[in-house]
Amino acid sequence: MARRRYLVAYDIREDRRLRNVASCMEGYGERIQYSVFVCDLSDQEAVLMRGDVEARMKPSEDSVMIIDLGRAGDSSRFLFLGHHEKLPTSAAVIV
């Protein structure tokens, strides 16, 4: 089963929902900035992640952006300036 790399960024307006979404995302990928995660997921895991995040956000106030970056493990689309977190090299761990 092919895995894809996703960049997930969010703007959650309320602290409780923000913590809830962040906690959810920690089960799917690696945090690379405060509200930005990189996730290497199968198609099924991507569907689960989307549903889990949608259940925790308020669509009328919050925003989540999910970008498909191509095959998992390909870091060639990233360019960092200054200090940055290491990109994930392993599959997602769903708790």
Residues covered by each model-derived region:
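Basic nucleic-acid-binding interfaces
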Residues: M1-L7, R13-V95
